[in-house]
């Protein structure tokens, strides 16, 4: 969904033609899998970070078009709402300095974004859900002025046959709201970690990504509040799942195949299973026309981009044109500081490599149903919720991280060749965060407990701390720092 489209109005024949081409491209991909023709290149890392533009009142600042024009940076992109943007980095092969390189690149890009946002009368903020966000902020007046977003909105409503889109979230409190557009999706901003894998290793990495999603969603949580309600430990999860809920083939909006999903099973033989599932169970959402040869897989890739698995397989191409597989891990919020984002990335890469390469595959010892339940319960309940692990025992997320996962992540990073200094630094941040139980979510909840449910004050204090780029476990509740301009 990151690519602009040409759009006017879709008619029945557009869907028929798109479906035909989607079948053709899925067949081509199946042939590539069968012939082992996908890239055998070593692991390649990358990530995307979604962020907010806010004004001097800590409310959304819907000026991403002016921001992007002024920044003139190919690594910055618009998002669904005019007050959101996305930061990208250049993917790179995993090497000893990967993590520190990522941090330097992110710091440089973030500094440019901060200055550019000030130049247009806004400020930059990284957070999972903006606490000051209101339902009125999510009006269609604030949808980004790109055809793909207008088309997405119209097509989601078309598939819902005009029925409103609603949130019904039970957490510490209850939130129920309905809208006639897809703008609820813009409430949730995330860190999306990419890992390109060789074809013959992709099943293990994909399944490992699913298994480690439960601890990662809790460790990286930074979104407890939505519309002044304290909901899940990571409220992004139900918000995003419900905001584009149109179901699968036949319009079964309450059926088993949701557009935003944890998935329906582990990968068994290959990641082709996900693309076959896309073809068979998900109706075409954006039936645009491309003037490209089928081997570019434009139709397949766009269709896959309108299905938001929390661990999403992607097809791309190496510089020499060889098709490759990537896994996009989408469970974690945009973090309280840039160094927290890199620590989260380190924890993911270390854990996923450890579990993808261990001799005894963990997916053979933990059912998919257990893995899925672990994920949703962790997203709702956080660090002190118990999950079942492949060894057959139950642990709280806190126990699991401190007693085994940090050591396993360290082993994984060592095997990847990450420098000891970097792995110790970033995993040390995770360790301190979990020992103190001060995740982004917990800091926000504690602030509200100490100061009342004043979302503007909370956001101002959060913004002040974010300017210092110190990890969230070191944050206090003193708001005497630099104010939002």
Regions picked out by a protein language model, each given a short descriptive name:
Residues 1-485:
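Phosphate/nucleotide-binding catalytic core
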